[in-house]
A protein has these predicted regions:
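Basic, helix-initiating cap at the start of DNA-binding domains
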Residues: 1-34, 38-50, 57-64
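Amphipathic, non-transmembrane alpha-helical scaffold segments
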Residues: 16, 24, 70, 74, ...
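Hydrophobic packing within well-folded, soluble alpha/beta domains
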Residues: 23, 27, 31, 44, ...
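Amphipathic alpha-helical linker/stalk segments
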Residues: 67-98, 104-106, 110
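Amphipathic alpha-helical packing segments from all-alpha helical-bundle domains
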Residues: 93, 109-113, 117, 127-153, ...
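Helix-loop "lid/cap" segments that line or gate small-molecule binding pockets
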Residues: 100-107, 115-123
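Membrane-interface starts of transmembrane alpha-helices
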Residues: 158, 162-166
Length: 170
């Protein structure tokens, strides 16, 4: 058994995980290429070479599938930011490092395409904008706000409203 205490997945479970990842990859490409409204579950199923029933068994709605795409697109950078926003003896340098990493991430092609998609679709589908905020900037803002509040409490950063400071940095 691995050190994490979790049993490794069996073949069937591993296939399910692989299939889910493949669905999310195809959906991401479809959403980015065609937009949310123009992407259908039928088109995703056709590209995968499977049935809509299989697709629905993994994701009960297009919104759930889009949420999985957002989670996939943001999980790696969210972990990177969480690692950067650990308590530090040099909080100002840590804030600077976070800001540089954040701006570098936003300038990459895929995040730019994702942001454009959200902006383009949010007018017709405001729930999509809310879903994006809850999955992407929201958790990052919460991490940064808590980090800044800790720095302010320890005296390493000037006292201010940590939420306003986090908003200003992002």
């Amino acid at each position: 058994m691995p050190k994490s205490g979790k049993k490794p997945p069996g073949k069937r479970e591993a296939r399910k995980i692989d299939r889910r990842e493949a669905i999310v990859e195809v959906a991401k490409r479809q959403f980015l290429d065609n937009g949310y409204a123009a992407t259908s579950m039928s088109a995703i199923a056709a590209e995968l070479g499977g049935s809509k029933a299989t697709l629905w068994s993994y994701f009960p709605s297009k919104e759930d599938l889009f949420a999985a795409v957002l989670d996939d697109a943001t999980s790696a950078y969210r972990q990177q930011f969480a690692d950067l926003l650990r308590p530090s003896k040099d909080m100002p340098s840590a804030v600077l490092q976070f800001t540089r990493s954040f701006m570098a991430k936003l300038a990459l092609p895929e995040p730019l395409r994702l942001h454009r998609l959200i902006v383009a679709e949010s007018g017709r589908n405001p729930e999509l904008g809310q879903l994006f905020f809850e999955r992407a900037p929201g958790p990052t803002l919460a991490l940064l706000k808590d980090f800044l509040a800790d720095g302010m409490a320890s005296g390493q950063l000037r006292q201010a409203d940590p939420q306003l400071a986090a908003d200003a940095l992002t």
